[in-house]
Amino acid sequence: VGMLFQHGALYSAFTVLENIAFPLRELKALPEDLVRDAVMVKLQMVGLDPAHAHKMPADLSGGMVKRVALARALIMDPPLLLLDEPTAGLDPDRSDAFCDLLRSLHRELGLTVVMVTHDLDTIYEISTRVAVVADRHVIVNAPPREVIGFDHPFVRNFFLGGRGLRAMELLRLHPADV
């Protein structure tokens, strides 16, 4: 299982290379040259130039931190990827690019992705199923179009409130269509 934490959770005293390599080095099963090669492959996989490998986390933008953390989450080639608010704190264009990257990784690697998010744009952009938690229970688990039509106060407020309606409008979804 690979995990991408909301704020990246990079080790501030480690370089990008050291952060991504950390899980492999903990296993002590691969020679250092193979660890470095794997890190460089993952850096490129998440859209970062290998020249960033020797930078410190403090020298990275928020979007770059997310991509480095994603590379670390992918370094062990997990079949399951857990994402905690993956687009939180990103500018809209960086958020769109990150969603494109996640969609591409899902398609190319066959990853199963479980994501926690409150970002309606991200939900509509990349989710094939949505599980809504309210009152400490999963109240609905369905494709986004079906979730929108589920009759529950939380669902109505979240998906059909002002922000939800604006997000649906951008995607040309209308409450009457669901």
Write out the residue ranges for each language-model feature.
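Helical segment within the ABC ATPase nucleotide-binding domain
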Residues: 96-108
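Conserved catalytic motifs of ABC-family nucleotide-binding domains
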Residues: 77
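A short, surface-exposed alpha-helical micro-motif characterized by mixed small hydrophobic
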Residues: 123-125
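Conserved ABC ATPase "signature" region
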Residues: 33-51
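Catalytic Walker B motif of ABC-type/P-loop ATPase nucleotide-binding domains
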Residues: 81-84
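Conserved ABC ATPase signature
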Residues: 56-60, 64
